[in-house]
Amino acid sequence: MSIQSNEILETIRMVADQNFDVRTITVGIDLHDCISCDIDELNRNIYRKITTVGKDLVETANILSAKYGVPIVNQRISVTPIAQIAAATKADSYVSVAQTLDRAAKAIGVSFIGGFSALVQKGMSPSDEVLIRSIPEAMKTTDIVCSSINIGSTRAGINMDAVKLAGETIKRTADITPEGFGCAKIVVFCNAVEDNPFMAGAFHGAGEADAVINVGVSGPGVVKEALANSHADTLTEVAEVVKKTAFKITRVGELIGQEAAKMLNIPFGILDLSLAPTPAIGDSVARILETMGLTVCGTHGTTAALALLNDAVKKGGMMASGSVGGLSGAFIPVSEDEGMIAAAESGILTLDKLEAMTAVCSVGLDMIAVPGKTPAHTLSGIIADEAAIGMINGKTTAVRIIPVTGKDVGESVEFGGLLGYAPIMPVKEGSCEIFVNRGGRIPAPVQSMKN
């Protein structure tokens, strides 16, 4: 792939005019050496390790941002799933651990900390259940702690007992946090990845080093402008434009990641290629799809356009870096994408269409606000549907859904900042309560048997 002089100028304009940024430098920290039978000692150990390993992260990001002229929007921490780390305490609540994570993250100045998590794709240990039941109070009493639950995988199937509990947990969190905001910090996964730098689903996987740097880039506005200014006629040419643009975006992220690793003396892990939108005008994944030829995101052809975008981003990014990982694709969070917001408000982008789109993009149903009266079993049904797509197709899928207490279809909710605002979207009539209450496990599909 040859690089022309005008493309170098385009790279400069990416930052100046097109909202390009490095969305996050995330340091993953292993907490296994913090384990103790005493929960107070565990909390002290966790605080000490996070504040020691992560103490220079924010300063390093600021130095690199000034040096290269590229905004680095967030600095974050991910930790080993707390359900594993706190198990030895035999405590009946892990809220104090969440509060320790919150204090430690604030002490070093990072934006978010992830890893208040449980991996329950095949079954729940007592510690896993304690953690999940602690999530509502943890989200209520902390500010920047993020939580995730992995309830299924292609190799294990879907743990429907965990799906039921996850729905109840989200509903409870919505009831006790203002406008359900706590739910914006909870993700339910199928096939969760261990090196995700993005929140709210980041955790530090069991196969990772003691500490590692993972970087997430963001450039929907860059891709849209490249398409708008190109002479691409066919979709083949559109894919080529996206691929070349993703290459340039990825090279910047790779540079930042490698430099951060040197300065912090922490190994560089992965670069996540995901196009992560913001509520800002000109920073929208939906608008990219519309630039390809759709009148509005959500109309017929949207899933195909998104598949093209996702694949071209991966191809361009893989050529630019040997460290591609995480989720790497295109995010479609409704409240964080002004184009998605507009399409949802018009009624054209629906929950059903979003579910179809998740079969071909990076993650899943993300930052979707639903009526506060939505029952827990409906939330569980939505999670199960999304998990089934991930399980059968061997990809990561997820649900981050916010039942907004006291609000109904036709209203909207304001989250602020990068989380934006969202119209309340309708859910289906009818009930899946009997199905969800059956529990058990949806067996792993035939394609899980690969050995």
Curated annotation (Swiss-Prot):
Leader peptide range in chain numbering: none
Listed CDD domains: RNR_PFL_like_DUF711 (cd08025)
A Pfam family reported for this protein in Swiss-Prot or TrEMBL: DUF711
Disulfide-bonded cysteines: none
InterPro entries named in the record: UPF0210
Oligomeric form and interacting partners: Homodimer.
Family: Belongs to the UPF0210 family.
Protein name in UniProt: UPF0210 protein Asuc_1169
Species annotation: Actinobacillus succinogenes (strain ATCC 55618 / DSM 22257 / CCUG 43843 / 130Z)
